[in-house]
């Protein structure tokens, strides 16, 4: 698959596969860098960050290594269940990467992205010593806080594309479906809850982050990894589906209703009597914080200095086909919703990509693998302001979690005896 000459004067072509099979494809990095430099930088951050969280988990011991493995498996299930098991709900396509799995649909860095998000959130929340009822909700919202700059900036730089007309992701925030934030809040909270609730049932007398017998840890890991996604889906049922599907309420409203409910539980937990954190920060703790700083600053630098219109994605995207052909989705309440089965390449509403870098030539019907081109910022200053605001909030939140809930032990004063 080759693309026409791009606006930077070089040929935008598919990455040359070094190794190619359905399970894993290894692509030439130089081709990918030429097409999408910000994507390569983003991937490197999550690969390194995922390995750092693993090293941190091993250094902490106890249940943290089990938790890390559980997150990894939970992410694989959550990111691929819809593509493989329920393809009618398949609604996003990653750009190609140096190492990508499952027929070119699962990049390596996405596997490690989930530990970067959820592990960092859970470890930061653990320092607050919140009551058990508040912890999953806090982990959910902190996961969203880590995710937001990634979601907003990466899609603008065509690191992936969304389905154009899927009703579940139709309502957007800077081209990010509001349900993406809802997804991260509910799936991470569900996984965290099941990981600990299962172990509390199997070994009720063992402290939360202390490892029990291998059977208890194995079953809690398997149950949370396999069922965390389904718990997250269930949390869509009481709020999102009735309000959005039955009453046509915008997904922004349903997300902020979820946010309000989470916040109430978290606030009650914060105002409860709870012990201060007595653990001193280790070198690995500071590495986690450094990794978060790099994560946030990378996306700030992208919107400040980089140009999305120079990013070109050659690979799998939404299949192109007849503009009027529909397919149906059935909601948990039995309603039938409809979406276009194919991308109508001559009439679509995803303004973060177009076909200008290939001379405006749209892909023919039947295309699944084709070239798309990033588009310029409509207002770069607005993106800079939004990401800056998120960075300010994240700085305050993580500083408070790590440094403001610490028990201060006064220095021991030794009185001298008078002779």
Annotate each language-model stretch with its function:
Residues 1-419:
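Aromatic-rich, lipid-facing transmembrane alpha helices and their immediate juxtamembrane interface loops
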